[in-house]
């Protein structure tokens, strides 16, 4: 490509592409002022960009302009089994479509390496107090997901460039951090920065290593898999200067929850953050990963740390080879990615955050950016009066206490802190409350090894925190069934029940249908709440219990010291543990076995895997942006959990009724997430969240919460799925009207697929979350944005209207939303077309990512 900039990398047998020379040739001295992100993007352009547009693309970075799109070519795609599987189902369906049109299906393969980790499908049916919980939960997972795992095994053997980590081995982001990311790639004699996109919003976990890794929707991931560039405009790059040091007893969880609140207020949505300064340098890689992981919770696209000695120490600790560690340091220093080469980097905005200001924190209820200092529990109305009656759960009962999520279990300090608190509690005779479903689900098998090395796993097990899985579990809503007696008591007494978890999201209804609210906390606090059993407990002030001598025990009495935590981490976490876990795991991955047939033999009765419908039926017909009726009128902060929930399927839901008709017993309904490879089940999850507030669903004069819609012009309120079926039968084009921050949360492609299959042509909102907006475009749904000061309320939209969209769809063009009111009034409202790039216009005009690829593939085949 741009071979003039290919040069030998000193001290190695490899070459590299000299982005500094390319940038300084345009603007002498400019490279030294570029932020870390810009340097990595510049290298990607110099190595991969068409020479004809290289100079203009680099000028966008050098001059901090956002006037034109430039290409970005990620080195890898990482997927979990839910979105990864649905992406591969789409590619399998694409092979069918290509074959039916006379093309060669075997030529449809990912061009970019794809790593799929099965981590989202295990539910914690057996809690950590069952010594056989891990084996039982895995057996249930295999039984429930046989169809899915059969398909995933076929993809490994049929597609090129697809590696699969089977279930029971850990969480995608933690494996990416501990093993899969080399930080610096070496391929075809060239060294270059590792970059990746992942089908999960927490993909920035490995930004802690200095790797640009961003979450994308499944549809955008498919686009990258198939070899297309990810076109972008220069993002807002914000410097975050970390000063000071943590106070004693403060965990990385406390820090990230404080940062999440701070950064939300600073409005960093969509930005690439670069954490720098003495405070950043003092953080371990595990602490950095906890911070980077929660980028989507504070709204950022990426959360970068620079490569430095902490990075190389971590690479050694996790068993990377000496040669790889040396390459990382050599390349980073040569290419200006080492921390001390970025002293003169300039930012459009720099924020300052003092680590010493952080206190012990939780977050909640309902939002991860709703910081809750543990010293303010009573003042905030969380802690309060409660009484424990024999045989009854208290108000605010903690029914789930889960040490879960890569956010915290990839940080040895957090895990060891929880284990030491458990040890101290056991020594004082404290126990878990019987109604608390406790669990430990690390994101890596290495966690088990270092807990055993420290002789601390038995201490966690004694309190009910035995290992239930190496998977996402409770963090992504797979908390499993409650004890039937506990569930019945919650229903009979209409009890306010809660969950406390070391995860990254706590939206209402996400963790468990019967946990009305959830709170995020550090792993040691999770253990403490399992002991007290209610969120009404003032964790800093109240007495947890009494020891064998009758002496009161408080949290400070059992909280471990930083010195002890650090000493045990230093003595118990070892490189050989990571090698023992990952060397055999990746040896098995490399052995894909015999090649399978290029076309999948779809199972007609499967409710998990079904040939997708995107090239046939209504989606293949003419589209219209006229006469659209609203399916829903929604407020602010609609999440992808509202749009397409992931948690357990209940028997009285539309999906539950369908599965029962298909012959599945209720105990094997599984979660909505696991059925996303079957559109007939998955589309019944559209707007199926019981906490949805559709402002059109007015019953007895008031808006009724639930999965409800009002069919117009009839005016009948009914269940959302029945309304969708009614409109589908009428071939009625639909629109959704919404408030600010539409589509926040998980990077869930079915949040877009579901509305498209329902017949929704347009979403008009006050603002969109980045990943969901690209997913809508990838499905051929048009995102439009109200102008500031205009919204559904100022326009008096009540759902009886019909809507047209008028105007030429070009990047960020002004279009007209025409409202036809029931009384005959016509109102024209200017809106912004949120097709932001020419590439997005091309995808939308083709009907979506897959439709465009099929067209392009057949055209190129015919030309050849």
List the predicted regions and their residue ranges.
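N-terminal amphipathic, basic-rich helices that act as targeting or association modules
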Residues: 1-139, 283-293, 297-321, 604-644, ...
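Mobile "lid/hinge" segments at catalytic clefts and subdomain interfaces of large enzymes
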Residues: 37, 184-329, 338, 422-434, ...
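Long, structured ligand/cofactor-binding scaffold of large enzymes
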Residues: 50-242, 254-257, 360-363, 377-471, ...
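Terminal amphipathic helices with adjacent charged low-complexity linkers/tails
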Residues: 73, 92-147, 280-385, 540-601, ...
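Extracellular/luminal Protease-associated
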Residues: 243, 272, 276-283, 504, ...
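Acidic, glycine-rich flexible loop/linker segments
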Residues: 547-562, 568, 772-843
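NTP/phosphate- and nucleic-acid-binding module
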Residues: 674-675, 683-717, 725-729, 784, ...
């Amino acid at each position: 490509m741009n071979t003039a900039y290919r040069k030998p990398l000193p001290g190695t047998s490899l070459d590299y592409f000299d982005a500094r020379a390319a940038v300084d040739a345009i603007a002498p001295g400019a490279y030294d002022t570029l932020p870390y992100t810009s340097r990595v993007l510049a290298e990607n352009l110099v190595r991969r960009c068409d020479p004809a547009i290289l100079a203009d693309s680099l000028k966008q970075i050098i001059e901090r302009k956002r006037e034109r799109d430039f290409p970005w070519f990620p080195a890898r795609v990482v997927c979990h089994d839910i979105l990864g599987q649905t992406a591969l189902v789409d590619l399998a369906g694409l092979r069918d479509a290509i074959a039916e049109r006379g093309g060669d299906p075997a030529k449809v393969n990912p061009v970019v390496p794809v790593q799929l980790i099965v981590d989202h499908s295990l539910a914690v049916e057996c809690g950590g107090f069952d010594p056989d919980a891990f084996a039982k939960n895995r057996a249930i997972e295999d039984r429930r997901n046989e169809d899915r795992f059969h398909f995933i095994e076929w993809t490994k053997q049929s597609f090129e460039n697809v590696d699969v980590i089977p279930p029971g081995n850990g969480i995608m982001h933690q494996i990416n951090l501990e093993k899969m990311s080399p930080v610096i790639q070496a391929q075809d004699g060239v060294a270059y920065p590792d970059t990746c996109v992942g089908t999960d919003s927490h993909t920035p976990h490995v930004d802690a290593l200095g790797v640009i890794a961003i979450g994308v929707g499944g549809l955008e991931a498919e686009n990258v898999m198939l070899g297309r560039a990810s076109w972008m405009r220069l993002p807002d790059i914000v410097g975050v200067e970390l000063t000071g040091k943590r106070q004693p007893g403060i965990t990385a969880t406390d820090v990230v929850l404080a940062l999440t609140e701070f950064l939300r207020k600073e409005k960093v949505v969509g930005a690439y953050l670069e954490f720098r300064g003495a405070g950043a340098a003092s953080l371990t890689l595990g602490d950095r990963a906890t911070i980077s992981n929660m980028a989507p919770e504070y709204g950022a696209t990426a959360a970068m740390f620079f490569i430095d000695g902490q990075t190389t120490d971590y690479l050694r600790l996790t068993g990377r080879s000496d040669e790889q560690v040396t390459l990382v340091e050599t390349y980073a220093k040569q290419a200006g990615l080492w921390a001390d080469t970025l002293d003169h980097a300039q930012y459009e905005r720099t924020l300052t955050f003092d680590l010493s200001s952080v206190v012990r924190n939780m977050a909640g209820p309902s939002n991860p950016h709703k910081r809750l200092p543990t010293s303010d529990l009573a003042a905030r109305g969380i802690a309060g009066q409660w009484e424990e009656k024999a045989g009854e759960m208290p108000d605010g009962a903690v029914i789930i206490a889960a040490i879960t999520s890569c956010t915290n279990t990839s940080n040895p300090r957090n895990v060891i802190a929880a284990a030491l608190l458990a040890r101290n509690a056991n020594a004082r005779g404290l126990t878990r409350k019987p109604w608390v479903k406790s669990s430990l689900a690390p994101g890596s098998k290495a966690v088990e090894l270092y807990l055993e090395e420290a002789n601390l796993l038995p201490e966690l097990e004694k309190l009910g925190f035995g290992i239930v899985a190496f998977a996402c579990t409770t963090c992504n809503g797979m908390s499993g069934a409650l004890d039937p007696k506990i569930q019945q008591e919650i229903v009979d007494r209409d009890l306010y029940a809660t969950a406390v978890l070391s995860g990254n999201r706590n939206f209402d209804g996400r963790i468990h249908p019967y946990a009305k609210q959830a709170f995020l906390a550090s792993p040691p606090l999770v253990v403490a709440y399992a002991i007290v059993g209610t969120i009404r407990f003032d964790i800093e002030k109240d007495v947890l219990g009494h020891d064998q001598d009758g002496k009161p025990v408080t949290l400070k009495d059992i909280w471990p010291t930083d010195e002890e935590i650090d000493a045990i981490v230093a003595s118990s976490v070892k490189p050989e543990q990571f090698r023992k876990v990952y060397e055999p795991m990746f040896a098995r991955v490399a052995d894909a076995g015999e090649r399978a047939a290029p076309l999948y033999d779809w199972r007609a009765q499967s409710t998990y895997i079904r040939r997708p419908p995107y090239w046939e039926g209504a989606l293949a017909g003419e589209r219209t942006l006229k006469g659209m009726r609203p399916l829903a009128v929604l407020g602010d902060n609609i999440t992808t959990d509202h749009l397409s929930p992931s948690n357990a399927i209940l028997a009285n839901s539309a999906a539950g009724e369908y599965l029962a008709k298909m012959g599945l017993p209720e105990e094997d309904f599984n979660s909505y997430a696991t059925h996303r490879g079957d559109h007939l089940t998955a589309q019944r999850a559209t707007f199926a969240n019981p906490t949805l507030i559709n402002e059109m669903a007015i019953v007895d004069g008031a808006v009724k919460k639930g999965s409800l819609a009002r069919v117009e012009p009839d005016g009948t309120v009914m269940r959302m799925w029945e309304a969708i079926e009614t409109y589908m039968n009428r071939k009625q084009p639909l629109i959704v009207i919404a408030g600010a921050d539409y589509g926040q949360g998980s990077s869930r492609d079915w949040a877009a697929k579901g509305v498209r299959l329902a017949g929704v042509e347009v979403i008009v909102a006050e603002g969109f979350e980045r990943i969901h907006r690209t997913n809508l475009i990838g499905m051929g749904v048009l995102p439009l944005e109200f102008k500031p000061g205009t919204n559904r309320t100022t326009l008096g939209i009540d759902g009886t209207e019909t809507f047209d969209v008028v105007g030429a769809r070009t990047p960020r063009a002004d279009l007209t939303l025409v409202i036809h009111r029931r009384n005959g009034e016509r109102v024209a409202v200017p809106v912004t077309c949120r097709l932001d790039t020419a590439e997005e216009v091309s995808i939308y005009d083709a009907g979506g990512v897959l439709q465009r690829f099929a067209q392009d593939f057949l055209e190129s085949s015919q030309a050849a």
